[in-house]
Design a protein with these regions (language model features):
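A transmembrane helix-and-boundary motif of multi-pass membrane transporters/channels
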Residues: 1-225
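Long, hydrophobic alpha-helical segments that serve as membrane-spanning/inserting helices
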Residues: 1-38, 183-249, 261, 265-377
């Protein structure tokens, strides 16, 4: 299965990373900088619009709304929603504690008490990111000397923050929206293609010398796993994109981690195998399974890109490959007397890891198909 010609930004970045082609727009108008320019324009639009609306609504300090819009506007809709939630909760908690503690006691003791109470409450509620914002709100309400009541100052602060958040959410959602779940889907395409590249780099060292790119490809795969895990949190904050979107994305992330662990185990099992000869006795079954695993990574990446997982890849059958490899091992078992015990054990370990990777690949497609509800009425 081939990926569509109109690749997304992240897929084009992967092609550049794997040296499949050069950046089509180098310099000032590269793909990465285009994304940066759009985010900068959206931030400027949100801040300016919020300042204008705040003045129109009669807020005395319109700049606080602009500050809120700048803080919560993130690179994708899901992250913006998460940041908005944290800021709303932090502002409400800070306003409540700032006003309440200003009614009794004297500075600085009531201020210290308000900060302690707000931070502890946020910690107990699991609102770690909101605790800092609550502290900022308390500081403004209790320490900024202004005419008027503390209650009025608290209400103004909440109103300005709410306005900034509403404007930021509107701009993020309707002006060149960048959905976290779509970016995560593209990130998963990258992840499984990089895992396939890692698999190929590992097998280059069996029974030859290890690939020179192995370490860098492994680091790329690990970085992609971490980035996609962060995107999942943002994707969960977005409105659902359809039946099974979040379930499917979460399933693929879990299998991606399992496949990475299996590939690392395969790499360890191949240490010292550059002169092994026993594994040659397992050909062509071993080579056929390895080739189909390579194709399996690319097929799964294509399925993620199309978001369809119910089509069995016609030219390969991983379970049949495993069965043929087991038969081949049974046939050559008597030839092991001419090889070292370490060499034989290494060959057995390799075939076990290959079988595990093959079954994980198949299970990732089948389980994701079930998670997204394919074939259900």
């Amino acid at each position: 299965m081939r990926l569509k010609a109109n690749k997304t930004w992240s897929q084009q970045q992967l092609a550049i990373k794997l040296r499949l082609h050069q950046d089509p727009a180098p310099g000032l108008f590269s793909l990465e900088r285009q994304h940066l320019f759009i985010l900068a324009a959206k931030t400027a639009l949100a801040a300016t619009l919020c300042w204008w609306l705040a003045r129109a609504f009669g807020f005395h300090e319109a700049y606080w709304g602009s500050i809120s819009a700048i803080i919560v506007l993130q690179s994708n809709v899901g992250s913006t929603i998460t940041a908005s939630r944290d800021r709303i909760l932090g502002t409400l908690i800070g306003a409540a504690f700032g006003f309440s503690f200003s009614l009794f006691g004297a500075l600085p003791w009531n201020y210290i008490g308000a900060l302690l109470a707000a931070v502890i409450l946020c910690g107990l509620l699991g609102l770690r990111n909101s605790s800092r914002l609550a502290g900022v709100t308390i500081t403004i309400i209790m320490l900024v000397q202004k005419a008027g009541s503390r209650w009025g100052l608290a209400l103004d602060r909440v109103g300005e923050v709410m306005l900034g958040i509403v404007v930021a959410l509107a701009v993020s959602t309707f002006v060149f929206p960048d959905r976290a779940r779509v970016r995560l889907r593209d990130g998963l395409v990258q992840e499984f293609l990089i895992l396939g590249a890692l698999f190929e780099a590992i097998l280059e060292g069996f029974p030859a010398s290890p690939s020179g790119d192995l370490s860098s490809v492994r680091q790329d795969a690990l970085a992609m796993l971490r980035e996609n895990n962060q995107l999942l949190e943002s994707a969960r904050s977005e409105p659902s994109g359809g039946p099974g979107w979040n379930e499917g994305l979460n399933t693929l992330l879990q299998f991606g981690r399992s496949l990475f662990d299996a590939l690392v185990a395969l790499e360890f099992s191949l240490e010292g195998s550059h002169q092994d000869g026993y594994a040659q006795q397992l050909e062509p079954a071993l080579g056929k399974l390895a080739a189909d695993i390579r194709s399996g990574f690319h097929h799964l990446a294509g399925s993620i890109h199309e978001w369809r997982f119910d089509a069995e890849p016609p030219p390969m059958n991983l379970e049949e490959d495993i069965e043929q490899l087991e038969k081949q091992m049974e046939q050559v078992r008597h030839t092991g007397i001419g090889f070292s015990q370490a060499e034989i054990l290494r060959a057995y370990a390799v075939q076990l890891h290959l079988k595990q990777i093959a079954r994980l690949l198949r299970a990732s497609r089948v389980e994701t198909s079930r998670a997204v509800g394919e074939g259900q009425n």
